[in-house]
């Protein structure tokens, strides 16, 4: 069994460490609890611009010198902006661990936000927004997120063209000063490293970094807005997105929700692939997945079909979810559970993955969760639990977004759901 260490450092950092002494690598992840939800409503895209510009120069180094310093120790680094967090990840040899932390402290604590680099990033973000027009699936994701989560959590990380035009370097500095503090940081470490040394290194390099107050941990309210919206676009295919409320990652029914999604969309023998694509030939692609911001959970169904078959595809997607409570078989349940457990044991076996999983545990549960505990909850799911979940979470309030030549026609599959008022075409 893994021996996790979890503590709050005097500097304000919440730290989790998973020692893996047989591996000659260390991975760490720094999550700053400020993502797009922390942006002013008229400056959407700001959080991503800050993340993209942090490593373009510090008080000590230029952006190129900073990259050279990471390369000199063979560190693999990455960063990203999400709804609730801005994340920085690193994998490095144990002997270079402290240097890697030192470099991250430098870019997080003393960025200079060079004007030329900032301007380039604004232009790149604008180009990426324009590029969404050539990615129908990404466009549907953007549109449905607004309806599923509301004006705060439903923001797109890139922002909008009109808000990007208002963002200045001074805005980036203000966002960094207000949100980048040790008290807003969750740090996970996994690999060949003594937990005490990990704590000492992070304490030393982040001591005095802003407030130690544990900010950014309260869930942000979701504003779910059921309804149907169509976005006309000259495409050969029709994109369909469906969303309905599920449960959050800390809910007792979360393992049941995971297994349901495994039955629907977990592998080549899953229901959606078999019934919607293989047997009926309705779709080019089809999937079901979940998203779980803190305190909320959403289930999504997505498909790409022909405009002529969009109504049939929509009805079939919902029918396959409903049908689970009628004819689920024990062998089907066991296959889904085996797939989930195998995925946890194989894809999650790399040091980087274990580090990311530990960060997720701290973020969602406030503690490290042993893999054995997660596996036990998955394997305990029964057919009766799945039926109870589906009965307790009816699909009677849906967000539906279509993108393509024609809207849904208002078939019985659409109108039988409460709150399904059709919005004007966008």
Language model features with spans:
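Phosphate-proximal small/polar/acidic motifs at interfaces that engage nucleotide phosphates
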Residues: 273-274
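His/Glu-based metal-binding/catalytic segments typifying zinc-dependent metallopeptidases
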Residues: 13, 18-34, 44, 213-270, ...
């Amino acid at each position: 069994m893994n021996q996790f260490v979890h503590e709050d450092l005097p500097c304000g950092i919440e730290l989790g460490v998973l020692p893996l002494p047989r591996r000659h690598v260390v991975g760490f992840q720094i999550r700053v609890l400020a993502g797009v939800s922390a942006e002013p409503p008229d400056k959407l895209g700001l959080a991503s611009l800050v993340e993209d510009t942090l490593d373009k120069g510090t008080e000590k180094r230029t952006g190129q010198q900073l990259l050279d310093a990471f390369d000199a120790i063979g560190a693999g680094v990455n960063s990203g902006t999400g709804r609730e967090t801005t994340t920085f990840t690193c994998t490095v040899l144990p002997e270079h661990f402290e240097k890697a932390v030192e470099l991250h402290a430098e870019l997080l604590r003393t960025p200079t936000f060079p004007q030329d680099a900032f301007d380039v990033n604004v232009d790149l973000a604008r180009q990426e927004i324009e590029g969404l027009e050539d990615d129908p699936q990404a466009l549907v994701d953007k549109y449905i997120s607004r309806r599923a989560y509301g004006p705060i959590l439903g923001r797109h990380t890139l922002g909008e063209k009109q808000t990007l035009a208002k963002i200045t370097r001074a805005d980036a500095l203000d966002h960094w000063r207000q949100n980048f503090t040790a008290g807003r940081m969750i740090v996970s470490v996994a690999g060949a490293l003594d937990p005490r040394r990990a704590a000492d290194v992070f304490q030393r390099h982040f001591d005095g970094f802003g407030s130690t107050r544990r900010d950014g941990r309260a869930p942000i309210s979701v504003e779910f807005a059921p309804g149907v919206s169509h976005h006309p676009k000259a495409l050969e295919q029709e994109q369909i997105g469906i969303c309905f409320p599920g449960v959050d990652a800390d809910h007792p029914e979360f393992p049941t929700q995971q297994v349901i999604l495994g039955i629907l969309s977990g592998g080549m023998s899953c229901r959606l692939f078999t019934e919607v694509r293989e047997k009926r030939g309705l779709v080019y692609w089809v999937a079901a997945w979940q998203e779980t911001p803190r305190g909320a959970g959403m289930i999504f169904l997505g498909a790409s079909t022909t405009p002529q078959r969009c109504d049939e595809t929509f009805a079939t997607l919902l029918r396959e979810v409903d049908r689970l409570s009628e004819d689920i078989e024990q062998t089907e349940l066991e296959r889904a559970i085996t797939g989930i457990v195998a995925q946890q044991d194989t894809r999650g076996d790399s040091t980087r993955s274990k580090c990311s999983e530990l960060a997720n545990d701290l973020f969602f549960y406030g503690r490290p969760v042993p893999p054995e505990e997660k596996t036990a909850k998955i394997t305990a799911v029964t057919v009766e639990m799945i039926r109870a979940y589906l009965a307790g979470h009816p699909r009677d309030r849906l967000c539906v977004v279509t993108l393509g030549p024609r809207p849904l026609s208002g078939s019985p599959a659409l109108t039988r759901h409460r709150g399904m008022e059709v919005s004007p075409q966008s």
